[in-house]
Amino acid sequence: MRRGDVFIADLIPRSGSEQTGRRPVVIISNDGFNLTQNWRSIIVVPLSTSTSQALRTQTAVMIPQGEAGLSQDSVALCHQVTTLDRSKLKNRLGELTQAKMLEIERGLKAAMDLI
């Protein structure tokens, strides 16, 4: 598992407006952590198929159907970045392009006011 990989993850339990259920996520944590088997925590951005969210904020990044194995148009919700135990990651769908990862990095910077 590497930075930019898209996995199906079990986001349960969650509460409030957090993304929940079984859904795709993109790994954003450093590969130094990702490739260390004893390191259990993985930092991810959840994806949603509610593409109208992409119009609401600069922290949402559109990912078209087919990219990274996604079966539907999706939106990376950079404002909902979260940490998961790697056991919650189920099957790998694919990998985002470097260009798409740069868009996600910009979304993360906007979400955390790092611009």
Language model features by range: what are they?
Residues M1-I115:
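Conserved functional hotspots at enzyme active or ligand-binding sites that engage polyanionic ligands
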